[in-house]
């Protein structure tokens, strides 16, 4: 009996595992250059969990912005810099290396930068919405 239960659990786990995610060009709300893979859920939905993985080239920046929902991030590889506030200031950023975890509560103003190529996994509640402090920084308004 336990073998059939174990087999069922393994089959469920296989359906929920992502082995080699396909990276896609980033959405309209991020500056050009990043690649994004949706691992779980739908970050554009009006509710529900999502997990995405971002691959960022060296020097990639996301200007000061905020999200309406809490955001959790784990650095998979490379170095990911995070700063708080309304003005991008590299001297005030904290560097997170591989394996580092951080979270930002909703509406917290922040900015980020990759130091070397970085892969970051982000998990949160949908929708994943990026609200730029300076509307001129919003790439969706430039396309």
Report each predicted region and the residues it spans.
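Glycine- and acidic-residue-biased ligand/ion/polar-headgroup-sensing regions
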Residues: 57-60, 66-87
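Conserved short histidine dyad/triad with adjacent acidic residue
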Residues: 50-67, 96, 106
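Short acidic-glycine-tyrosine-enriched beta hairpin
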Residues: 86-107
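Double-stranded beta-helix
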Residues: 91-94, 113-143
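Short beta-strand His + acidic residue motifs that chelate non-heme Fe in jelly-roll/DSBH
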Residues: 62-64, 82-83, 104, 109-115
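Mature catalytic domains of secreted/periplasmic carbohydrate-active enzymes
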Residues: 9-10, 71, 125, 133
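A short, N-terminal "cap"/entry segment at the start of jelly-roll beta-barrel domains
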Residues: 2-48, 135-143
């Amino acid at each position: 009996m336990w073998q059939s239960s174990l087999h069922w659990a393994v089959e469920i786990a296989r359906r929920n595992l992502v082995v080699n995610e396909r990276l896609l060009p980033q959405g309209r709300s991020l500056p050009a250059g990043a690649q994004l893979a949706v691992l779980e859920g739908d970050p554009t939905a009006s509710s529900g969990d999502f997990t995405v993985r971002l691959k960022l080239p060296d020097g990639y920046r996301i200007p000061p912005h905020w999200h309406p929902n809490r955001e959790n991030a784990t650095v998979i590889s490379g170095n990911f810099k995070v700063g708080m506030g309304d003005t991008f200031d590299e001297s005030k950023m904290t560097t997170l290396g591989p394996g580092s975890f951080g979270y930002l509560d909703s509406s917290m103003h922040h900015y980020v930068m990759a130091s070397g190529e970085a892969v970051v996994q982000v998990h949160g509640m949908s929708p994943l919405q990026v609200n730029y402090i300076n509307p001129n920084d919003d790439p969706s308004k430039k396309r």
